[in-house]
Amino acid sequence: MDRDNKVLFSIISKCLILIKKRYGRDINLDTIPTDDEAVYKLIMTDTGSDVFALEHAKYAKPKDEICSTEIRHIEAMHAIVHRSMHEKYCQYVENKHDPKNIEYRSDIEECVLAETYGVLLYVEQLVEIINSYSGISKEVSARIAKYIRKGMQPELSVWKSVFVVGTQQNGYTQEQAQQIWEWLKIEGELTTYRDIAASAAFTTYQCYWLKTYYPNEYKDALVPNVNNDESWSGM
């Protein structure tokens, strides 16, 4: 767990204790809806830096342009910023606002990449595409994905021929298979694990949910060493 998430978890814990103390309510954040329009409105308009995972300036523009109505948008934002994917950010925003212009090379890519508007963001997507095109097992596809992300050229040279042959057996020409391989090497290098992005996204959403519905308690939870003292409430 990185520093930002540790800080956020501490804030969330303090906030929940304050809510329990003041209102007698036990809030289970694991069960809150993740499609709350009021929460997304705050995410889009909030200019504060107290949600620490979003305090860095590089999050400001992606937050405004990506995080609109679904938790997957927040996941994408964290993935893009975490790996500094500027070109993918531009492509994601453009495709998100005009999905009719997305062009998929195959049904395989449309099936895997539709939820990220045709942009390869996650290791899990990379593994799925390798497996679906070539028939290489998921386990080995995951190993190839690792080689791609780490730029391990000797290992990739060994697996290129296996991928190309397998893809040809699934109905693609040698030229098409080689083009797909090169595309995977380029686009797959900056992918991130979805579970990491999902965890960061849900933590971010939880903070904004608390900030939306319990703003005083959330504010008080930000105060260092507050110890849940009512004198800090500002109520």
State what each model feature region is:
Residues M1-M235:
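Noncatalytic, beta-rich nucleic-acid-contacting surfaces in large DNA/RNA-processing enzymes
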